[in-house]
Amino acid sequence: STGANFNDVLGELSPLIKDLESFNTVADKKGYPSNIKAGHFIINKGMNNNEIVNAIRNGNVPVIVKFNNQERIENLAGSLANQLDADSISFLKAMRNEQFLNKYGLTKETALCNFIPNSYEVYWNISPENFNDKMHEESNKFWNDDRIKKTKNINLTKTQVISLAAIVQKETAK
């Protein structure tokens, strides 16, 4: 996790390490104890100590974050916190941040519209602020000219369509 020290890392990895002394030697030679990075790493059974150290030094791999329509922004923050490094309070603060809302023309009531339900590839330790920005980019990709035209054809706004979709999903899930 973010803020871990070398002993924390050893505690997490100890079930995978056959020779702890050898692992410490390799880690020291590569300068790992003084350069620990948070992230999501893939450690496979049978990897040797050098491969493990290389994986945790250089191998932060993306994770897939999934969420569906949420009725409340607090629910979304909780879902994200279960999948990523930051806690739900940090996500919630970022989603309600006035600068974020103003930057993208949102209000506290419409902030949830920035988050289009889907699966997204992000780094496990992405900051809530960077996650918000990524979701805004994804929202812009989703709301292309064709979709915006369709909302106008049925006399609805993007916000109304998103709200309606959330209601439909909630009702069909019953």
Q: For each predicted feature, which ranges?
A:
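Conserved catalytic or metal-liganding residues and their short signature motifs at active sites
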Residues: 1-174
